[in-house]
């Protein structure tokens, strides 16, 4: 018999196989696409703001996004694995030292800004596209290589003749 935790973990794996959820943390500016049904029509409404909290509770995980709209602070809490979430996009990463940024509720203007976190890239990103190697693709490369060797060899001969 499966426990509730095992069932929740299976559901999380199933949801993650269907849609990709990016890594984001409190302080990051994110754009959440929310699926809204009005009558028979479905549309996507975007909510962009600063992630001020994230709760990791298996299938019950959620996050709170805060934005300032027409001078008023608006906060919205979303279920991380909910069906209403269409997309989550990280706009920029914020540099903070707290897990919950509830202190931003009391601040406005410049004091509510969060510095951008600069992430160092480790390693070299190489985009390799496999191509079929055939005689047709090798012929132009071989011809150019022969021309370069001929051009390099000729000036050396001329210089040696001039010295004599």
UniProtKB/Swiss-Prot annotation:
It holds the Pfam family Ribosomal_L19. GO terms for cellular component: cytosolic large ribosomal subunit. The lineage of its organism: Bacteria, Pseudomonadati, Pseudomonadota, Alphaproteobacteria, Candidatus Pelagibacterales. One of its GO terms (biological process) is translation. The keyword Cell division does not apply. SUPFAM superfamilies: Translation proteins SH3-like domain. Belongs to the bacterial ribosomal protein bL19 family. Keywords: Ribonucleoprotein, Ribosomal protein. HAMAP family: Ribosomal_bL19. InterPro entries: Ribosomal_bL19, Ribosomal_bL19_CS, Ribosomal_bL19_sf, Translation_prot_SH3-like_sf. Disulfide bonds: none annotated. NCBIfam families: rplS_bact. Residues 144-164 are annotated as: Disordered. This protein is located at the 30S-50S ribosomal subunit interface and may play a role in the structure and function of the aminoacyl-tRNA binding site. This is Large ribosomal subunit protein bL19.
């Amino acid at each position: 018999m499966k426990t509730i935790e095992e069932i929740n973990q299976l559901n999380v794996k199933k949801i993650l196989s269907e849609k990709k959820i990016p890594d984001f943390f409190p302080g990051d500016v994110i754009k959440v696409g929310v699926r809204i049904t009005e009558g028979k029509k479905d549309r996507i409404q975007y909510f962009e703001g600063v992630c001020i909290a994230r709760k990791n509770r298996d299938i019950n995980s959620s996050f709170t996004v805060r934005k300032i709209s027409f001078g008023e602070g608006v906060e919205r809490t979303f279920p991380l694995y909910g069906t209403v979430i269409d997309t989550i996009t990280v706009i920029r990463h914020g540099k903070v030292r707290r897990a919950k940024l509830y202190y931003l509720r009391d601040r406005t203007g410049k004091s509510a800004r969060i510095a951008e976190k600069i992430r160092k890239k480790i390693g070299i990103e190489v985009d390799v596209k496999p191509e079929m190697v055939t005689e047709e693709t090798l012929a132009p490369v071989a011809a150019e290589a022969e021309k370069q060797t001929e051009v390099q060899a000729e000036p050396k001969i001329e210089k040696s003749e001039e010295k004599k």
